[in-house]
């Protein structure tokens, strides 16, 4: 099950000086336009968001080569400029959503689309719209463990799985250590974003994103 690219926004990239939004029809196979109209830049920008060959440095964003040249110096001196390059909005197929909830054994994810953002300031990708119901997931898993009523009450108020590690054991919390260990399997991101949404993205969404291939010789 692959995600479907729904929309692309190009902000500042090569010949693109102003934001351009393009809706992508699933049936589109060809982009037609006049010479120097931006077709090559548009397609290469999309390709660089998730190129099929991770080792190809020609398809990684580079400020010096990709930012519009006549605005590059101003950009480098303007710390308030966010440095947006391109945003791709994807549709998550119903079948994948059902698979996620089935494998997690509780209905915690119902997002149908999200946006994948690339930025000159930070090479890390940012995502908009990937959210899950951490509270429902925590409560669901906690039912399998011997825990005190006070601890169960605290658990019912937790909004993120990364907070489970902070729970303090009461005398009746026979299984708290085991519960923490189980939750830790889903909250193991050392870079910061450490909720159930991250686990779902890494485990299910990211592998389902289409890879892009760009070439200009034929």
Regions found by a protein language model. Give the residues of each.
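A common structural microfeature
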Residues: 19, 28, 83-85, 212
């Amino acid at each position: 099950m692959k995600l479907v690219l729904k929309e692309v926004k190009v902000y500042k990239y090569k010949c693109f000086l102003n934001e351009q939004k393009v809706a992508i029809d699933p049936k589109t196979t060809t982009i037609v336009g006049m010479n120097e109209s931006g077709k090559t830049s548009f397609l290469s920008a999309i390709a660089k968001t998730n190129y099929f060959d991770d080792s190809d440095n020609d398809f990684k964003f580079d400020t010096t080569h990709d930012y519009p040249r006549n605005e590059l110096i101003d950009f480098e001196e303007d710390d308030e400029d966010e440095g947006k390059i391109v945003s791709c909005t994807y549709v998550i197929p119903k079948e994948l959503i059902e698979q996620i909830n089935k494998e997690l054994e509780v209905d915690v994810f119902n997002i149908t689309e999200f946006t994948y953002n690339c930025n000159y300031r930070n090479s890390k990708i940012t995502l908009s719209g990937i959210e899950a119901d951490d509270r429902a997931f925590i409560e669901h898993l906690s039912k399998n463990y011997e825990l005190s009523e006070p601890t169960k009450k605290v658990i019912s108020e937790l909004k993120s799985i990364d907070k489970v590690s902070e729970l303090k054991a009461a005398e009746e919390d026979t299984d708290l250590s085991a519960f923490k260990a189980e939750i830790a399997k889903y909250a193991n991101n050392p870079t910061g974003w450490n909720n159930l949404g991250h686990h779902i993205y890494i485990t299910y969404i990211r592998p389902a994103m289409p890879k892009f291939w760009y070439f200009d010789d034929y």
